Amino acid sequence: MIDSDGFRANVGIIICNRYGQVMWARRFGQHSWQFPQGGVDDGESAEEAMYRELYEEVGLRPEHVHILTSTRSWLRYRLPKRLVRQDSKPVCIGQKQKWFLLQLKSQDSAINLSSSGHPEFDDWRWVSYWYPVRQVVSFKRDVYRKVMKEFAATALSFQTQEIPRKRGRQKTTG
């Protein structure tokens, strides 16, 4: 769904664990990392799109997560000119996103990047809460800063345990 201003309706998903960390995923075959996100289909609510994208991108079902909150309004970013497909109609100049903060209720092993058969991501890890703001591709940075600021009090209040000392291989950064 592309609106009259050229922005595609999209949902963004931030998954947090009991340590106050967030899931950070690497785009398939690329060196860029981001939160899961995806388009809202015609006739689909933002929440329905979030659950669909959650399964398609990271293999999680509604029973694996709890919705903590969502953004009060849609947040927008423009695509760099080199990424705008001028030959498509209507032309999409960026994304308008409704963001959801989810708490993971299941074990990390429930995360499956290949659940849809067309993986969006090829790796993931837990990172400190503010890490993504510094690391995301530049044209998404302002939206990430806004959403992380809006969600900070809620996300960080759900930290129920200290991060364990490293024992063996762990997927953590930041």
UniProtKB/Swiss-Prot annotation:
Keywords linked to the UniProt accession: Hydrolase
Enzyme class: hydrolase
GO BP: mRNA catabolic process
Record-linked InterPro entries: Nudix_hydrolase, NUDIX_hydrolase-like_dom_sf, NUDIX_hydrolase_CS, NUDIX_hydrolase_dom, RppH
GO molecular function: mRNA 5'-diphosphatase activity
UniProt xrefs under SUPFAM superfamilies: Nudix
Keyword set includes Hydrolase: yes
Short sequence motif Nudix box: positions: 38-59
Name used for this protein in its record: RNA pyrophosphohydrolase
Organism this protein belongs to: Shewanella sp. (strain W3-18-1)
